[in-house]
């Protein structure tokens, strides 16, 4: 992986699960990596993260390259590093490619199979 891969993965964790527990952060990281390993998605982490309409924060271009600060960023960065260097995974999410916050109901969710809920996110696989 590159420094840019690490930065993009950490940014995704931070914006999608920055206030979640470590397990919630790891889960978002795993979805990102699962997508990277799927032929349905781009072939590098930054392209997966910035793929149009995939992660809501990434639709705001002003957030793409700013470097966050604070304990949630530090935790997100540490988890991204653990995932990329050690392959840390969340049990039960190996086939999951989708999730959403529990306070929204996206149209695509009815076409998926829920796998688990971690923190405020519901994780899915395809039917």
Over which residues does each language-model region extend?
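Bacterial extracytoplasmic/cell-wall-associated proteins, especially those involved in peptidoglycan
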Residues: 1-127
């Amino acid at each position: 992986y590159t420094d840019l891969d690490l930065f993009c993965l950490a940014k995704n964790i931070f914006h999608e699960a920055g206030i979640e527990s470590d397990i919630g952060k790891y889960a978002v990281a795993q979805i990102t990596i699962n997508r990277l390993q799927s032929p349905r998605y781009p072939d590098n982490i930054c392209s997966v993260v910035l793929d149009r309409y995939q992660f809501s924060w990434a639709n705001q271009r002003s957030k793409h390259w700013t470097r966050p600060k604070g304990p949630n960023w530090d935790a997100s960065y540490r988890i991204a590093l653990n995932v990329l260097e050690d392959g840390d995974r969340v049990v039960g999410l190996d086939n999951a490619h989708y999730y959403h916050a529990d306070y929204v109901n996206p149209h695509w969710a009815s076409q998926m199979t829920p796998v688990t809920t971690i923190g405020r996110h519901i994780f899915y696989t395809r039917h």
